[in-house]
């Protein structure tokens, strides 16, 4: 029976340490301050923005929300990013995704100053991860690494299968695991032999948004399973993994909710503080 990787618990431990860092900055007259640009009325995005704001307040961080209408033009969003980039009182900028179809989200991300890039998704910061010369990382990927580290799950020499190739989770978590000398395979929607790959994996990270994709027959005994998926099935939030059955074979497994999600939010706050310290010559 798999031991639960409790992301909420780890996030709260990290949160207490981060509060002290914020307190130290405030004693020097510096308050971490970031902005979230949310375009449109996506209900899930609005919930996520509010969740971040609550966490920011708990950490002592200022978060401003720029709520733009769904029909916002690209140039308006770009001009707002330019304004925030140039404001010395703003330490971080992020664009809430997904954006409406008329918006080129990639162009918005490219416009963010890499030194204010809370999400770690500007091209230069993504590139730095692969060059192993990074100062900011996408929050979910960094949260997964922190979770494994807390539970003393070593990556060196392990066979890892990452299911999903997004810039937000799949690619960066693969890069961070390679950096720690894991042997990483990235699978995706066109992978034909997924079960064959996962059965040989010591660690599986699934980030596809496909409910119950990973089943008991696809994993070996003692596997570590990190489920990043968030899917609604019959009014219930579930992951990519058939949790109840896979946990019988896993040595460690994350629940959904309460696994990776709280760490994603926490590491966004960690990023804001890291950027603030960097901009003020503290690291």
From Swiss-Prot:
Biochemical pathway: One-carbon metabolism; tetrahydrofolate interconversion
Pfam family, one: THF_DHG_CYH_C
GO BP term, example: tetrahydrofolate interconversion
Reaction catalysed by this enzyme: (6R)-5,10-methylene-5,6,7,8-tetrahydrofolate + NADP(+) = (6R)-5,10-methenyltetrahydrofolate + NADPH; (6R)-5,10-methenyltetrahydrofolate + H2O = (6R)-10-formyltetrahydrofolate + H(+)
EC number: 1.5.1.5, 3.5.4.9
Binding of NADP(+), residues: 164-166, 189
GO CC annotations, alphabetized: cytosol
Keywords: Amino-acid biosynthesis, Histidine biosynthesis, Hydrolase, Methionine biosynthesis, Multifunctional enzyme, NADP, One-carbon metabolism, Oxidoreductase, Purine biosynthesis
SUPFAM superfamilies attached to this UniProt entry: Aminoacid dehydrogenase-like, N-terminal domain (SSF53223), NAD(P)-binding Rossmann-fold domains (SSF51735)
Function of the protein: Catalyzes the oxidation of 5,10-methylenetetrahydrofolate to 5,10-methenyltetrahydrofolate and then the hydrolysis of 5,10-methenyltetrahydrofolate to 10-formyltetrahydrofolate.
HAMAP family registered for this protein in UniProt: THF_DHG_CYH (MF_01576)
Family: Belongs to the tetrahydrofolate dehydrogenase/cyclohydrolase family.
Protein name, UniProt field: Bifunctional protein FolD
Protein's organism: Lactobacillus acidophilus (strain ATCC 700396 / NCK56 / N2 / NCFM)
């Amino acid at each position: 029976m798999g031991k639960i990787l409790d992301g909420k618990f780890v996030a709260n431990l990290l949160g207490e340490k981060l509060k002290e860092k914020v307190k130290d900055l405030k004693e020097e007259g510096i308050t971490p301050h970031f902005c979230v640009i949310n375009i449109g009325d996506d209900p899930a995005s609005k919930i996520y923005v509010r969740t971040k704001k609550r966490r920011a307040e708990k950490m002592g961080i200022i978060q401003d929300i720029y709520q733009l209408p769904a029909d916002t033009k690209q140039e308006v969003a770009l001009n707002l990013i330019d304004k925030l980039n140039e404001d010395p009182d703003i330490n971080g900028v992020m664009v809430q995704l997904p954006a409406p179809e008329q918006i080129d989200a990639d162009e918005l991300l490219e416009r963010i100053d890499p030194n204010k890039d809370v999400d770690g998704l500007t091209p230069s910061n993504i590139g730095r991860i692969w060059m192993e010369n990074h100062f900011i990382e996408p929050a979910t990927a960094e949260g997964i690494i922190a979770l494994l580290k807390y539970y003393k799950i070593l990556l060196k020499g392990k066979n890892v299968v990452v299911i999903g190739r997004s810039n937000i989770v799949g690619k960066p978590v693969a890069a961070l695991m390679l950096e720690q000398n894991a042997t990483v395979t990235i699978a995706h929607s066109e992978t034909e032999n997924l079960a064959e790959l996962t059965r040989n994996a010591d660690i599986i990270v699934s980030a596809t948004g496909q409910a119950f994709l990973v089943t008991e027959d696809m994993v070996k005994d003692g596997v570590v399973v990190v489920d990043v998926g968030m899917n609604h099935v019959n009014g219930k939030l579930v992951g990519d993994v058939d949790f109840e059955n896979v946990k019988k074979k896993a040595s460690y497994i994350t629940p959904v909710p309460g696994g990776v999600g709280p760490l994603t939010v926490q590491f966004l706050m960690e990023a804001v503080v890291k950027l603030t310290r960097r901009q003020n010559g503290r690291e």
